[in-house]
Each structure stands twice: as structure tokens, then as C-alpha cells.
Amino acid sequence: MVERARPSLIWEGSLWQQGILRVAGVDEVGRGALAGPVVAAAVILPAQMDPKELEGVRDSKQLRPQQRAQWAERIRQVALAVGVGSASAAEIDRLNIRQATVLAMQRALAKLDPIEHILLDGLPLAELGSRQTALVKGDHISLSIAAASVVAKVWRDALMQSWDRQYPGYGWRTNAGYGTREHRLALQNLGPTPQHRRSFAPLAELKVSRYDG
């Protein structure tokens, strides 16, 4: 079996060597969910830190829930700064998912001022300014981006679990608002809640337009 590459500080280190010390890794979760916000986190790690301090951190999808929770706490202890931002279902419907994701990232980054450079998972986003480096599969190769993915995932999952008590029947405690079979059946039987994304195809196709819970 081929071992997956671990996120490292190679990209951060190259910037630190140039005197660029406040480097924020940014990532988001929840883009494809049918309910709940899209959430972004931004993490600034200390320059020249020992990567062994966060050696178990991976892209959040590669970790079990308990591991994510433990590492999210450790990340907050080690990091110079951590910011979380979100954009609601209503904002997603009004703006579209891309613009709402950018908004969530901007809100997360606003909590970290000053920032000298951004490391971003995926493609460049002009809205975040010129001082950025976009990395394909950045959450697999950059430790600060991977850390951001863990923080964002833990924050969003906790929110969806709290909403599961407020809106029972949709299985948000386990599906986090994603379109599982259980969730789609609940939509047909119960209708959408105020936390559902009405602009997403499965919701737009529903004839039921109100929540009766």
C-alpha cells in the first residue's frame, strides 16, 4: 500500500525564508451540502515551527471525527491565529455557492489581521487579493491549509449537530447536511427548513416549500 503524502511546511517555509512570516492557510467545508452554511477557516502557524507538533494533521476528510476534534484543539493551541467565517444558506441562495465561499473566506481572514500571504486550496481567488498562492490539493500538501480544513470541519459539524436538535428528522448529526438518502427522504416528507439551500437542485425541484416542524 502506498502511504499518502503528509502535509508539510515546504510552502510556508519558502515564504518564511523571504521574511514573510504571517502566512495564512485557508480552506472551506460544506460547499456541496444541501443544508447549513459554507464554512471557511484560516490558520497562521508560527514561523519555523517544528512540524512534528502537528504531525497527525491531514485533510479533514482523511481523519475520523474524534481525531479531527483532538487535532482542532491542538491546532488552536499551536497556531498564532485562527479565524472561522461562514456564509448562511440564505446568502448562498442570494449570491451563489462560489461567491458565498469567497465571503466565508473573507470573514475568516478578517479575524487574522495582519496577513502577509495566503495559501489557498484549489484555484486562485482574485477577491482575496494578490498576495496568495493557490495549490492543487493544497489540503494534502500544506500543513496550514490542512489545519484550516480540520478547524472548519469541526466547527461546521458542531453547528449541524446543534441544529439537528432544532430540526429533527433530517439526520444532520451524522450527515452534516449533505444529501444522503435519509436526508433526501426527510426533505420529501418534512419539506425544507430555513437552513436548507433553496437554490440547490434537490431543493429547487421540491414541491413542498415550507417547513412544518
UniProtKB/Swiss-Prot annotation:
Cofactor binding note from Swiss-Prot or TrEMBL: Manganese or magnesium. Binds 1 divalent metal ion per monomer in the absence of substrate. May bind a second metal ion after substrate binding.
Xref: NCBIfam families: PRK00015.1-3
Main location: cytoplasm
E.C. no: 3.1.26.4
Binding, a divalent metal cation: 27-28, 121
The protein, known as: Ribonuclease HII
PROSITE patterns associated with the record: RNASE_H_2
Swiss-Prot/TrEMBL catalytic activity: Endonucleolytic cleavage to 5'-phosphomonoester
Entry keyword Nuclease: yes
UniProt-listed GO biological process terms: DNA replication, removal of RNA primer; mismatch repair
Protein source organism: Synechococcus sp. (strain JA-2-3B'a(2-13)) (Cyanobacteria bacterium Yellowstone B-Prime)
HAMAP family in alphabetical order: RNase_HII_B
Role played: Endonuclease that specifically degrades the RNA of RNA-DNA hybrids.
